[in-house]
């Protein structure tokens, strides 16, 4: 295997990708009042035209109260928003690309959007709230299938709702959705996955994004040992996850002492399922530097990425900031047009192109 093997096709169930590169989901807040318009379709279409294998959209929210923390985060419900997403799907497919929505509920996130009217402090979800939220995830999954998306991703990472159930620092419940072990705290996620699988059937690829780190705590850990990792991810695979998107700030960092496997490598080793690795691909500094300091990043080679891919640690590679700044990053890498690549600038975050 070699560098060029990253540009080989990937197939899983009905999902067919022209290469191993995935556009990572990145919140843009460019959908006025939750409706993705033509600029959003053009944004994703540019990447499809430039041979990105799979596009994961920014997080798009289910139909539940407080599911988002910004008014211009796209909705994944309602006729107007779904018409907008249908246009996005058709645009990407016309360019030869594949696309999956990242289905999302932010949960308890105090930062961000100020609603137009006051609201009470977040309360613990009732059992009825949980049931209705699971139903809403299933409805969003069915909408993704009906709109012609090639796959879907559930956002279970970075301290948002599904992840808030996983983590013992945010899940203090004393009922069946809480508990002292990660296996107990995974009940909500398992039920969401089962609802999604029931909605889309056996053939549509379901991806789950997960992480150890949280938006508020980069040192956070859900699984501190491989055994705890097994207790975390095996029930999720059994519930219906096809591909795990294992989010790290730096893909080259080992997950546990005694092995250089990263998070994606461990999840693949434990579950046997395909995985996506992510985290500062092609860059020297991680996304934390961007969020905390507004910092850009110089380029970096992908020699270590190739080594880990050759070893079979993961199947797909998600690229975020490089593709945000340069829609043609994948095709430039494919043809080794390295002199055309630029350092990442924080100003790119404010541009939808």
Can you say where each PLM-predicted feature lies in the sequence?
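Flavin-dependent oxidoreductase catalytic cores
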Residues: 1-353
């Amino acid at each position: 295997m070699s560098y060029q093997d990253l540009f080989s096709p990937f197939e899983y169930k009905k999902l067919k990708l022209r290469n191993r590169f995935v556009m990572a989901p990145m919140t843009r807040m460019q959908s006025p009042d939750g409706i993705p318009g033509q600029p959003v379709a053009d944004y994703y279409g540019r990447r499809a035209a430039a041979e990105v294998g799979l596009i994961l959209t920014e997080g798009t929210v289910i139909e539940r109260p407080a599911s988002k923390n910004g008014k211009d985060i796209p909705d994944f419900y309602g006729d107007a928003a779904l018409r907008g997403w249908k246009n996005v799907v058709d645009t990407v497919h016309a360019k030869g690309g594949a696309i999956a929505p990242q289905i999302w509920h932010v949960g308890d996130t105090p930062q961000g959007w100020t609603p137009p009217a006051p609201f009470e402090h977040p309360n613990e979800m009732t059992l009825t709230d949980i049931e209705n939220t699971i139903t809403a995830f299933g409805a969003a999954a069915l909408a993704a299938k009906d709109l012609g998306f090639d796959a879907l991703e559930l956002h279970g990472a970075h301290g948002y709702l599904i992840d808030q159930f996983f983590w013992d620092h945010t899940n203090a419940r004393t009922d069946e959705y809480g508990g002292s072990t990660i296996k107990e705290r995974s009940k909500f996620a398992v039920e969401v996955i089962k609802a999604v699988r029931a909605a889309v059937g056996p053939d549509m690829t379901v991806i789950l994004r997960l992480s150890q780190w949280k938006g508020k705590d980069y040192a956070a850990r859900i699984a501190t040992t491989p055994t705890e990792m097994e207790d975390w991810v095996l029930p999720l695979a059994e519930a219906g996850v096809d591909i795990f998107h294992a989010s790290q700030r730096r893909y080259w960092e080992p997950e546990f002492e005694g092995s250089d496997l990263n998070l994606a490598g461990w999840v693949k080793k434990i579950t046997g399922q395909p995985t996506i690795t992510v985290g500062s691909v092609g860059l020297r500094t991680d996304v934390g530097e961007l969020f905390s300091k507004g910092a850009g990043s110089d380029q970096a080679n992908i020699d270590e990425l190739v080594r880990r891919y050759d070893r079979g640690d993961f199947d797909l590679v998600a690229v975020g900031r490089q593709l945000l700044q340069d829609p043609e990053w994948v095709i430039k890498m494919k043809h080794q047009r390295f002199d055309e690549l630029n350092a990442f600038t924080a100003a790119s975050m404010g541009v939808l192109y």
